[in-house]
Amino acid sequence: MLILVSPAKTLDFEQPPLTQTHTRPDFLAYSQELIQVCQRLTPSDIATLMKVSDNIAGLNAARFGEWTPDYSIANAKQAIFAFRGDVYTGVDADTLTPEQLERTQSQLRILSGLYGLLRPLDLILPYRLEMGTALANPKGKNLYDFWGNILTEAVNRAVAEQGDELIINLASNEYFKAVKPKQLTGQLITPVFKDFKNGQYKVISFFAKKARGMMARYIIDQQVSSIDELKAFDVAGYYYSEELSKPNEPTFLREAQ
């Protein structure tokens, strides 16, 4: 069972990682191509392109300027410990045991605008380059054009290494668009999380992001290996709804918080 998640805008490079064990991203040569494009952008260009404040634009211009593929554990951090958004609150990587971290390294993959596809222990430098960014590059008008079939093929290789065909898509639409579902060799399962609000069940972004992270952690903790086992997910008040589910979209509901 392979799990796909999105990265996070919020980063933590202050706290030391819980382990020195690390790996290097598979697509650093591609990352360097993108960095070279980004290094030609002014802070004003970045502010417009990424729709961010001047301060954040300046910070990212500096990050692009300082980026080097020859980084190490001394100045970088493993992705699973560096990302600190809602999804990663749900994953709660700081409480993983060494055995759980090993399973996470095997089963979890993080889609990234800059790095392509990351394993949890892959070292990254601070960056911000969302997959939906319309960054013109030698391969096209945006990052979807840049990555092309590369990430789909990488996911297929990871699925083959797992030994089963299940792909659990817990990534956002923005990031999963970088993968071509029809070319995947595995069975794609996309869980849906809905909370009760104003008289109906609906997807609420903040809660859904955290739920995706909690499900990723649940799969690791419980060593889930089938869709039926996945349906038993009951963390933080969520429960499986047979009525609202579709064959490859199991739906989980939660009452008003």
Curated annotation (Swiss-Prot):
Pfam families: H2O2_YaaD. One of its GO terms (biological process) is response to hydroperoxide. GO terms for cellular component: cytosol. Transmembrane segments: none annotated. InterPro entries: YaaA. It comes from the Bacteria. Coiled coil: none annotated. Belongs to the UPF0246 family. NCBIfam families: PRK02101.1-1, PRK02101.1-3. This is UPF0246 protein Shewmr4_2963.
